Swiss-Prot record:
UniProtKB keywords: ATP-binding, Cytoplasm, Fatty acid biosynthesis, Fatty acid metabolism, Lipid biosynthesis, Lipid metabolism, Nucleotide-binding, Transferase
Family: Belongs to the AccA family.
The organism's taxonomic lineage, starting at the top: Bacteria, Bacillati, Cyanobacteriota, Cyanophyceae, Synechococcales
SUPFAM superfamilies named among the record's database cross-references: ClpP/crotonase (SSF52096)
Gene3D superfamilies: 2-enoyl-CoA Hydratase, Chain A, domain 1 (3.90.226.10)
Pfam families: ACCA
Record has Cytoplasm as a keyword: yes
Designated name of the protein: Acetyl-coenzyme A carboxylase carboxyl transferase subunit alpha
Span of domain CoA carboxyltransferase C-terminal: 40-294
Length: 329
């Protein structure tokens, strides 16, 4: 069993985790019954873990969303999808490995799946470009979404990216245009679209596959117009102010629910999805099936009109009481 990667704020759990590992080794190597001690330590660790994760700051949630062992797009596909067939290429000479897509079944329903894919180690991350898609990736996604629209297949997208790739080659190939075309065309699609932020949802890279009838996100996922590090560098010329930027950006599920951007926040296991990936998979599958059932009852015109209205309502703001008082005077 691979050792869990602990984040900085999880370090108080290290001693307990070490004790649990030692007792498990003792149980394997001898006939001594240590089940009671093991149960007590595991219960204590679970309680402390829950206390820590119930009090996470936005900056700490970003660390959880970026956790190297957090389930990825392909992990969820393997957990609850049948007959997965990956489709390749944008038909313009590229096949971006940072953004994948293909056909599968969820339960009895055939769907098109698209999503960003990060790597587990340095070699795989380089191959996947750390989940940052280039223009060819977004054009591949659009080609597959057009295919789904033609054959009346619901579209399920998994968002997990720090942002679209911002290198020189991406700009030369039309990164902004590729994302903009996706935004325009996703509003025109006649099939249900459900997007889920499974980890990090960063900037236009997330929005390029995120124009959906329903937007879901996990409890410790984040969805933001810019990374807190980038925001802090722009506003204060100091990336060290990223925690303050994270709080100001309103990137967490509860904040985004209040703003009317997210439709449902999915509960995570104690310690995050990386602690119990199968449980996370069950949660996501149940949510997708529920929302898919509701959306399939709508006509194509209703889907498109509701989708357009949903995004037109975004961007509301509230004035403070003092400002309202000044205006009334």
């Amino acid at each position: 069993m691979a050792r869990r990667f602990l984040l900085e704020f999880e370090k108080p759990l290290v001693e307990l985790e070490n004790q649990i590992d030692q007792i498990r080794e003792l149980a394997r190597d001898s006939e001594v019954d240590v089940s009671q001690q093991l149960l007590q330590l595991e219960t204590l660790a679970a309680r402390r873990r829950e206390e820590i994760f119930n009090a996470l700051t936005p900056a700490q949630k970003i660390q959880v969303a970026r956790h190297p062992q957090r389930p990825s797009t392909l992990d969820y596909i393997q957990m609850f999808c049948d007959d997965w067939v990956e489709l390749h290429g944008d038909r313009n000479g590229t096949d971006d490995q940072a953004l994948i897509g293909g056909l599968a079944r969820i339960g009895e329903k055939s769907v098109l799946l698209i999503g960003q894919q990060k790597g587990r180690d340095t070699k795989e991350n380089v191959a996947r470009n750390f989940g940052m898609a280039k223009p060819g990736g977004y054009r591949k996604a659009l080609r597959l979404m057009d295919h789904a629209d033609r054959f009346n297949l619901p579209i399920i997208s998994f968002i997990d990216t720090p942002g679209a790739y911002a290198g020189l080659i991406a700009e030369e190939q039309g990164q902004g245009e590729a994302i903009a075309v996706n935004l325009r065309e996703m509003f025109r699609l006649k099939v249900p679209i459900i997007a889920t932020v499974i980890g990090e949802g960063g900037s236009g890279g997330a929005l390029g596959i995120g124009v959906a009838d329903r937007l879901l996100m996990f409890e410790h996922s984040v969805y933001t117009v810019a990374s807190p590090e980038a925001c802090a560098s722009i506003l204060w010329r100091d990336a060290g102010k990223a925690p303050e930027a994270a709080s100001a950006l309103k990137i967490t599920g509860p904040d985004l629910m209040k703003l009317g951007i997210v439709d449902e926040v999915l509960k995570e296991p104690s310690g995050g999805n990386n602690w119990a990936p199968l449980q996370a998979g069950d949660t996501l599958k149940n949510a997708l099936e529920k929302h898919l059932s509701e959306l399939l009852a709508l006509s194509p015109d209703e889907l498109r009109n509701n989708r357009y209205s949903k995004f037109r309502k975004m961007g509301k703001y509230l004035e403070s009481q003092s400002i309202e008082s000044e205006i009334s005077v």
